[in-house]
Amino acid sequence: MNIFHGDAVPFAPADVNSFTGPARTKRLALDDVGVPVHVYRVEFEEGGRTNWHTHTGPQWLFIVDGRVRVQKWGEPAQEVSVGDAVVIHAGEKHWHGAAPGGRGAHIAVNVSATTDWLEPVSETDYKKK
């Protein structure tokens, strides 16, 4: 068993090549458990969101603060809140970020996955219901 204290790893500003608006990330899982698992806390201020992207493996989002908007390519955006979970399957083009008018945060768990970052989410698509 290993314990990683949340304050031991600082937040970093989100990569401007992969995010639009104010956001920050913190890697939470720092241990090799024999399976490539990446765990992050991602916090979005109002207007903050990822670019469209895909993963080569599954991703789980666990909403821990505020409201988060998620969208799969070709489908309407949906809003989720604290206590909700989202499962994104390998290869699904999607984005996630703060719901318009507020802030939000999630824990992201990526298993055996790399990320292919794509184009930014337009302001129109971000605000569209």
Listing of model-derived features with the role each one plays in the protein:
Residues 33, 69, 76-77, 81-82, ...:
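Ligand-binding loop in jelly-roll beta-barrel domains
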Residues 43:
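Short proline/glycine- and basic residue-enriched helix-capping loop/turn segments at helix->loop/beta transitions
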Residues 1-36, 116-129:
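A short, N-terminal "cap"/entry segment at the start of jelly-roll beta-barrel domains
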Residues 49, 54-82, 92:
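A short beta-strand-loop-beta hairpin characteristic of the jelly-roll/cupin
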